[in-house]
């Protein structure tokens, strides 16, 4: 089966390489023949309706609006620009005119959050007592006994070594 497939491949290759014995280039290119359209009859001369091209979609239209002619002075409503959102407004408020002396309420600045509040630095001449809390003792589970000093001969309990296990 393998030899049969190999023989087919060899024959195909030989035909493809050596099959075209005409080495001269063709003198003129081959032309495809097309059928001609039927000729119009003399009585068949009625006009053909060609529809107008559709205007582009309004959302896709990109050309500018047509300019108004000078004779066509129709008033056009142009809305006022919307003011910016109050939280996004960044420009300064307009200055009050001297004739308009209405009192303006300006709220007091808010104090900082208690957790973010910092005490002012003490001045060198101000000697008020400052409460400094004692350092917290370590957690009982993390507490370590202090190391014995060499001059302190406190008896230290050293347990006896355990006897070996009977099965070992």
From Swiss-Prot:
Compartments, as annotated in UniProt: Secreted
Chain residue ranges for the region called Disordered: 20-168
Keyword Signal: yes
GO process terms (BP): defense response to bacterium; innate immune response
Highest taxon of the lineage: Eukaryota
Propeptide section residues: 20-42, 63-70, 91-98, 119-124, 145-150
Signal sequence extent: 1-19
InterPro entries membership: Apidaecin
Keyword list, A-Z: Antibiotic, Antimicrobial, Cleavage on pair of basic residues, Immunity, Innate immunity, Repeat, Secreted, Signal
Keyword Signal: yes
Biased composition, class Pro residues, residue ranges: 158-168
Described purpose of this protein according to its UniProt entry: Apidaecins have bactericidal activity; predominantly against Gram-negative bacteria. They seem to interfere with cell propagation.
Name assigned to this protein: Apidaecins type 14
Organism field: Apis mellifera
């Amino acid at each position: 089966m393998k030899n049969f497939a190999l023989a087919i491949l060899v024959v195909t290759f030989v035909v493809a390489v050596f099959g075209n014995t005409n080495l001269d280039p063709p003198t003129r290119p081959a032309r495809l023949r097309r059928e001609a359209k039927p000729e119009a009859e003399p009585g068949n001369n009625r006009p053909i309706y060609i529809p107008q091209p559709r205007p582009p979609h309004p959302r896709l239209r990109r050309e500018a609006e047509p300019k108004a002619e000078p004779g066509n002075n129709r008033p056009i409503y142009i809305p006022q620009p919307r003011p910016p959102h109050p939280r996004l407004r960044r420009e300064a408020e307009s200055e009050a005119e001297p004739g308009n002396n209405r009192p303006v309420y300006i709220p007091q600045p808010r104090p900082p959050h208690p957790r973010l509040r910092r005490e002012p630095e003490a001045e060198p001449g101000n000697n008020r007592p400052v409460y400094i809390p004692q350092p917290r003792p370590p957690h009982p589970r993390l507490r370590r006994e202090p190391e014995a000093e060499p001059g302190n001969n406190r008896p230290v309990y050293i347990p006896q070594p355990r006897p070996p296990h009977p099965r070992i």
